[in-house]
């Protein structure tokens, strides 16, 4: 899920905080970000490198609007500089044998067909993959909206 931080497929559900980076990244990373009134941070990694950036003021004053993107920009420029001469295959993880990948709808988590426009490859321990008949959010929606 940490790659969803910059994945535009999740815009319908929740605007990914680093979606502006998706066109700038040439490698795959897991990324987490955080924000308060007084600071902002990004931490991301792949199998070769970990990069964390925090910005804020020692006197706890608030960041202004333009400063909130600083940590994100410093993070992506730094980690991409380290990885610039490596291929994606060299920097991402091999999938363990007990893990399987399933394309799912990024909102519902239900499996989708190859023709679906919005799909996200998610990984599961073999035997725990979602099935087309899994209700996922249906029960919650039915209870909340009386369907």
Residue ranges and their predicted role:
Residues 1-139, 143:
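A penicillin-recognizing enzyme superfamily signal
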């Amino acid at each position: 899920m940490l790659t969803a931080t910059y994945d535009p497929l999740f815009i319908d559900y929740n605007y990914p905080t680093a979606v502006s980076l998706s066109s700038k990244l040439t490698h795959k990373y897991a990324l987490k970000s955080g924000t308060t009134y007084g600071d902002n941070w990004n931490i991301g990694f792949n199998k070769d490198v970990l990069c964390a950036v925090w910005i804020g003021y020692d006197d706890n004053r608030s960041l202004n609007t333009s400063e909130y993107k600083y940590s994100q920009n410093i993070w992506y420029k730094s980690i991409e500089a380290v990885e610039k001469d490596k291929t994606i295959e060299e920097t991402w993880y091999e999938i363990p044998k007990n893990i399987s990948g399933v394309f799912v709808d990024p909102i519902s988590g239900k499996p989708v067909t190859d023709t679906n426009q919005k799909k996200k490859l998610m990984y599961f321990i073999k035997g725990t993959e979602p099935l087309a008949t899994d209700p996922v959010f249906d029960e919650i929606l039915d209870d909340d909206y009386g369907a």
